[in-house]
Amino acid sequence: MMKFKYFADMFLEIGMNEWKPSTRFKYESIVTKRLNFLNDREIESIKASELRLWFSQMRQEVGAKTLRDYKSCLNQIFQLAKYDLAISINPIDFLKNFKLVKPQIKPFTDSEVRIILKASECYSKKFQMFLKLGFYTGMRTGEILALKKENIDFDKRLIYVKLSRSKFGENSPKTSGSIRRVPIVDALYRDLEYYCIFTFIDYLFVNQYREPYNTDFSFTRYCWKPLLKSLNIPYRKLYVMRHTYATNILKNTNISPYELSRLLGHSSTEMVYNRYVKFIDNQKDEFKRDIKIY
């Protein structure tokens, strides 16, 4: 009889060289801290009903996204056991997926963006440029932190997004579609060019030790939070700059959802429609009935 732990360890070992560091950390934490209560069980003795009960109890502690991660791990572990003929049925097949309700985005208004950028002039040039890149390119914060001068082509007015930084270091961006080109708009061009001229290190954003930042923690704690507080603007994460860019470029230009999905580095238009187009539609006035259809 094979134990659950045997296949759980195999799952981690197989993924060790395939996953990004962040994914590896997440799955290791789930297997060792959440699923370890199954370790000594014979894998064929684990039933769908008891897993369903466990997930029901977990709903009181964690959200749907985390539950989906738990389910994904279990599914892959049981699938390995099925491949090895240790079980004939994967109990996860009998569990329904958890409905994921994403919180509604709250982008900044046009006037708030102007006020924020103006007020940021009291802070470092580094922080000012971080905000301008966020608001004028829609790049993810990790992608901005990984940006090097060699990734910027001022002649073609393009930024080449190739890497992203996080607490796990520097890696390829979120998806294959995230490796992309982002246009440098007029409002950003001169400021970015000037900033690069007086940046003597390849990375655009480095700390006092001349090393690139891994997270936006310092910007958030020492600049972003105090800035919003001083302006009486409700706090939102720096990542909301990306949502602000997306909603405003959809509202104010002729860009299509497909083109926007490519600018943002999404693998499909689904996110653009579900998040940004839907948000804009909800902001519109009541449907005008005096229009001429034909």
Could you say what each language-model-derived stretch is?
Residues 21, 103, 165, 264-289:
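Catalytic-site neighborhood detector that most strongly recognizes the C-terminal catalytic loop/helix
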Residues 115-119, 170-172, 180, 274-294:
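DNA/chromatin major-groove-contacting recognition/catalytic segments
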Residues 146-194:
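Conserved tyrosine-mediated DNA breakage-rejoining catalytic core shared by Y-recombinases
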Residues 2-8, 12-79, 84-86, 102, ...:
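N-terminal core-binding DNA-recognition domain of tyrosine site-specific recombinases/integrases
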Residues 185-234:
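Active-site/catalytic core of tyrosine-dependent DNA strand-transfer enzymes
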